[in-house]
Amino acid sequence: MHCALYTAGTCRSCQWLEKPYPQQLTDKQHHLQSLLSDRDVAQWLEPIAGEQSAFRNKAKMVVSGSVERPLLGMLHRDGTAVDLSACPLYPASFSPMFDVLKSFIARAGLTPYNVARKRGELKYLLLTESTHSGGVMLRFVLRSDNKLAQLRAALPWLQQQLPQLRVISANIQPVHMAIMEGEREIPLTEQQALEEQFNQVPLYIRPQSFFQTNPQVAAELYATARDWVRALAIDSMWDLFCGVGGFGLHCALPETRLTGIEISAEAIACARQSAKTLGLQHVDFQALDSTRFATAEGSVPQLVLVNPPRRGIGKALCDYLNQMAPGYILYSSCNAESMAKDIEMLPDYRIERVQLFDMFPHTAHYEVLTLLVRN
């Protein structure tokens, strides 16, 4: 992948860009194998890869510059702004949207937030596109609601220019810190969820719910989890840290008793909407802390699926999984190092199968799916 920003030295986010892509996959696989070298792995599967450019469905843009000439991109530590509108990780559909949004910022008088001076209102633009419908979700991250009336008044022009905008909201983030969003979300459109679809499974994205940024590889990840789980012929499962329900909804058959747990109420609303669309009758999605739910629950499912944040599932949940002893644990991880530490705390389980998913080309990061079977 050629990137003018990388060549110019203005953006080095893709730290492995100069490394040939086959070598990237080899290095990631070797890293994963080294982390699990102390455990026997019955089956190592080949890494799954997708497109090397234009694969992202989401842009997180710092807004800087002036209201007349805004920049969308990132800030270096010294405060230097870099416009990332031409980043080759974004699909071709993003560039014209960025152009319109720059005009809109000026038209609506949304002064970019100046970090050094602690002045201005518009901090970030967050853009997500559905590969299923082409619809787009747009979030304005503001320091306060001072410019909210101006934003609302100018929106009809923006919606006329970009009819693909289905979900628009404003997020209020008042803190002078590099935090992407605050707790308060203000819907600006009647529609509040963007529909996506992977492998004929409808999924919904709300403003404050997490969703994978590489749809092509994410669809492969979910499909692989589905195939592994259905081969086990189970009839009950937990999906912990379930997000919008992607894993559980892929794996569940109509008769499967599925419990999905996620701390985010927004994500749970999405999961419930998907389950309703699919007509699944034996599904229960709840907005709870996954560890607290598991350790307080009396029943034992046949399979527990975990998809934790980068920190992993931790000692408390590992200890409880050892105690409750489900037949299978399916572990999906965005941080193989924390996953390896967790697996060390699951001595009663053997590693049946491992597969790497290259969700983040040109970086050292990747996702991994591991099937653990009770001894």
Curated annotation (Swiss-Prot):
Residue ranges crossing the lipid bilayer per the database entry: none
Active site per UniProt: 334
Record's catalysed reaction(s): uridine(747) in 23S rRNA + S-adenosyl-L-methionine = 5-methyluridine(747) in 23S rRNA + S-adenosyl-L-homocysteine + H(+)
InterPro entries assigned: 23SrRNA_MeTrfase_RlmC, MeTrfase_TrmA_AS, MeTrfase_TrmA_CS, SAM-dependent_MTases_sf, U5_MeTrfase_fam
EC number(s) reported in the record: 2.1.1.189
PANTHER family hit by this protein: RNA M5U METHYLTRANSFERASE, TRNA (URACIL(54)-C(5))-METHYLTRANSFERASE
Protein name per UniProt: 23S rRNA (uracil(747)-C(5))-methyltransferase RlmC
Biological source species: Serratia proteamaculans (strain 568)
